[in-house]
């Protein structure tokens, strides 16, 4: 039984082998190539065009035909396909069609693209382990256990990151995100979470549900001044939005639209090329590749030969992103099947739940595949099956159409490239031949009506610094302009409700393109409009009328010396007189014999009593004599130093007195903003709704807060314009707070006005533009060019230079202070110290001689002399007792007794002489 059994088993094996070859392989003996089958499930909508082949179905056939014609890719294999059509959102029909294709033995199923249908087909493919190829964005949960699929559409997290990088590159501080359905919030989650990490404010809006009319939403965004908008919608909806935005007047250079659809390049953008709108999008189709361009051209030729399509806003014959992704998907599956060896395909039944035994192996081949297709580099994540590595072109609308301006990739991020040479720039990249509306107001010398004998029209009506500046900018940038005066005549301020007025409001409402005027750049205005770099720097100061000359005081003779110096001179006078009195009493050489001819006189005299000492000091200070002459060296030192001191003081006083008598002092009641804040007699204010008023209103400095409280409490303190404020300053006791440049211009032409104090703050005048205006940077560069060429200074000299007022000398002679003549007090003090030391020496020396002569102890002699010297009322005392004297016939010359010589006498002689007699 063994042999028959073996023979039977061999026959059965040969039978099944032959059956498999006949079923799945084309016999080589007949010369037929190997055949593989793929399945495609595509949706169609109800209506008259329901049976018309859509782009995806055509791409499915197109790619299969390309592969079959190109034998280098599948040399021994023929690719066949099965196409099934289903209704949108019909997941049951999608399940049935998928089972039918699996029964035919397909190696992979492509589509469908709609969410619920995709999930149904994916579940079947995962159960039977057949690769499912997805081509549309689809949210894949983190806990998704389906592994038998790949998605060629870029990963939504990467796309969201690309949008965020683009927004950051554009330096947007605010934007509006408009999404079509709830899946848009998932696709844009990276951008929506940006405010928590980046300095950007987002406003989220949703397009109308079940309606293509977006005009109410566009009107609301236009009213809200939302100029930077990100649209997450299909290309069909994008075409409708652009058409409706054009009708709403929103296709201007102030708007910037970003569309997340990868089919923006396929839209017919011809009507918007010269509108100035900033239109940015993404493209994954690699049109720069020559091979891709050839395939796209073949596709276009076939599509143009097809039946004409209804108006859809698309370019004729253009290859959409879905078609390109499907083309790449078919090629990847074909290449992977060619690389797989000894892999057979059998019919699969959905109700039997028996998977394809080669499905896992084939799925791994697909996930590990790397391919350069129409959409660039294709690499899948081996775990999730998502396409996370790809390149996105950043495209922008220019005059010549859409142009590639950058590239984004998950690895390298965003790289903005320069505009290629020879390609047309965006209409807003150049101001050449553009006509701009310029808003301004009358303000001398910036903008004034031109004086002329004939009637002037248009821009010729105006002249001034800003007009010359505008002409220079127009010459550099090549634009033309129309000047319009602002309706309310105001610069622009924000009320309590947040509403703006003046030129700022006209820029916000896009009634003007530029505001060329002395418009101050402030933090509050920067939130509403954009500014160029300042063309003039300045600050707030005080305009006040010049003070009249004041009558001198009856005590103005005291002004040459400061009060401190007068006090110090008085103290020095008192001190020197007292020291002179004390030293004169202590010094023995200051005592003299009042009667030198009377040898019996026992009394010596001292002229420097307390009153005489004061009289001596007063006579020296007044440059008059006192007939009191010091005799001792110590008292002469005091006298000499005091005379030197009085010489310097009197000379300085005389010199400074001349300045005070010849120069009339001009005194102003205020010298600074602090002086204004501390008083209420002089009323002060600023131009209403101007930058100066806003500065005081927003300031947190206590002085300025106090000033604003004063101005706001008195409505009359604020003036309508500068002319009213100047007239009020001239006629009333009023100070006008205004820009220093205007004060400089006014004081050059009105000599009765002057600037009080320095600058309170520092700021600049800039040219205002609407928020997000493409002209701002161009204007800034032109201003910097004018500054480098010194033309801004030349223009200012032209308009600020007037007849001028005679320059005033410094009319305030400063009183001499201790810093200037303090040294003379030091010399005086040193002289006093020296005289005291000399007096002490004289005192000790003389008393020692007296003690020896009278044969007394030195200490007792000193005590007696000190006791007498401290008796201030007495000017006479007994002279020291000399030795016993005898008469002689000799005549004694009194030149040897200098200490007894009377003042004014050179010598004395007596008829008798005395000689010492010793016992």
Curated annotation (Swiss-Prot):
Q: Where is the crosslink of kind Glycyl lysine isopeptide (Lys-Gly) (interchain with G-Cter in SUMO1)?
A: 887
Membrane protein topology class: Multi-pass membrane protein
Q: Which reaction does it catalyse?
A: Ca(2+)(in) = Ca(2+)(out)
Chain ranges sitting on the Cytoplasmic side read 585-636, 842-919
Q: Biological process GO terms, please?
A: chemical synaptic transmission; G protein-coupled glutamate receptor signaling pathway; glutamate receptor signaling pathway; modulation of chemical synaptic transmission; negative regulation of synaptic transmission, glutamatergic; regulation of membrane potential; synaptic transmission, glutamatergic
**SMART domains linked:** Lig_chan-Glu_bd (SM00918), PBPe (SM00079)
**Membrane spanning stretches:** 564-584, 637-657, 821-841
Domain of life of the source: Eukaryota
- List the stretches on the Extracellular face of the membrane: 32-563, 658-820
Give one Pfam hit by family name: Lig_chan
GO annotation, cellular component aspect: axon; cochlear hair cell ribbon synapse; dendrite; dendrite cytoplasm; glutamatergic synapse; kainate selective glutamate receptor complex; perikaryon; plasma membrane
Q: What Gene Ontology molecular function terms does this protein carry?
A: adenylate cyclase inhibiting G protein-coupled glutamate receptor activity; glutamate receptor activity; glutamate-gated calcium ion channel activity; glutamate-gated receptor activity; kainate selective glutamate receptor activity; ligand-gated monoatomic ion channel activity involved in regulation of presynaptic membrane potential; transmitter-gated monoatomic ion channel activity involved in regulation of postsynaptic membrane potential
Q: Provide the record's note on post-translational modification.
A: Mass spectrometry data suggest the protein is N-glycosylated at five distinct sites.
Q: Per the UniProt annotation, where are the glycans attached?
A: 70, 76, 278, 381, 415, 426, 433, 548, 551, 752
Q: List the disulfide bonds.
A: 99-350
Q: Which first-to-last residue range defines the signal peptide?
A: 1-31
Alphabetical UniProt keywords: Cell membrane, Disulfide bond, Glycoprotein, Ion channel, Ion transport, Isopeptide bond, Ligand-gated ion channel, Membrane, Phosphoprotein, Postsynaptic cell membrane, Receptor, Signal, Synapse, Transmembrane, Transmembrane helix, Transport, Ubl conjugation
Q: Where does the entry say this protein is expressed, by tissue?
A: Expressed in the olfactory bulb (at protein level). Expressed in the deep cortical layers, dentate gyrus, reticular thalamic nucleus, mammillary bodies, pons, and cerebellum of the adult.
**UniProt subcellular location:** Cell membrane; Postsynaptic cell membrane
**Where is the PTM Phosphoserine found along the chain?**
869
- Residues annotated to bind L-glutamate: 518, 520, 525, 691-692, 739
Family statement: Belongs to the glutamate-gated ion channel (TC 1.A.10.1) family. GRIK3 subfamily.
- What does the annotation say about its assembly with partners? Homotetramer, and heterotetramer with GRIK4 or GRIK5. Can form functional heteromeric receptors with GRIK2. Interacts with PRKCABP. Interacts with NETO2.
Q: What does this protein do?
A: Ionotropic glutamate receptor that functions as a cation-permeable ligand-gated ion channel, gated by L-glutamate and the glutamatergic agonist kainic acid. Binding of the excitatory neurotransmitter L-glutamate induces a conformation change, leading to the opening of the cation channel, and thereby converts the chemical signal to an electrical impulse. The receptor then desensitizes rapidly and enters a transient inactive state, characterized by the presence of bound agonist.
Note in the entry: The postsynaptic actions of Glu are mediated by a variety of receptors that are named according to their selective agonists. This receptor binds domoate > kainate >> L-glutamate = quisqualate >> AMPA = NMDA.
Q: What is this protein called?
A: Glutamate receptor ionotropic, kainate 3
Q: Which organism is it from?
A: Rattus norvegicus
